């Protein structure tokens, strides 16, 4: 799969990861990128054991088109496919990293 990094993601990455010298979290994000690049589509990724290790999830209800991955107890990486919503996992071959969310998970 192809990963596209948005400006919001790069800003959050520098602000929340780089400036605070979170080496463990930086390594985890690099591992997530390698795993996503290793698969051809989301169906293969969701069938692999990495789905449970890194907690890949699809949001529910009105945020159905958003996927999240746990970085640590506080931070989650938010991703969105670059195709229109009524899709199945085989069609998803490009993901955009939207941002790093730290608002709804407490202080870790």
Task: Please report, for each region that a protein language model flagged, where it lies by residue.
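An acidic, glycine-rich, mixed-charge low-complexity segment common to nucleic-acid enzymes
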Residues: 1-5, 54, 108
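A short, surface-exposed loop/turn module that caps and links secondary-structure elements
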Residues: 42-67
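Amphipathic alpha-helical interface surfaces
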Residues: 28-35, 55, 71, 75
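Short, charged helix-to-loop "capping" segments that act as catalytic/coupling loops
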Residues: 23, 50, 82-86
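Enriched for short, Lys/Arg-rich terminal
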Residues: 66-108
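Arg/Lys-rich, positively charged N-terminal/basic patches that mediate binding to nucleic acids
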Residues: 1-37
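Short, solvent-exposed polar/charged micro-motifs at secondary-structure junctions
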Residues: 14, 57-60, 108
């Amino acid at each position: 799969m192809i990963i596209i990094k948005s400006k919001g993601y790069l800003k959050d990455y520098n602000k929340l990861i780089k400036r605070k010298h979170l080496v463990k979290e930086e390594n985890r994000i690099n591992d997530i990128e390698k795993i996503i690049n290793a698969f051809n589509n989301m169906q293969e990724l969701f069938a692999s054991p990495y789905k449970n290790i890194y907690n890949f999830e699809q949001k529910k209800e009105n945020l159905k088109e958003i996927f999240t991955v746990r970085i640590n107890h506080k931070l989650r990486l938010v991703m969105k496919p670059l195709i229109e919503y009524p899709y199945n996992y085989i069609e998803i071959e490009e993901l955009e990293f939207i941002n790093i969310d730290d608002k709804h998970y407490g202080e870790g």
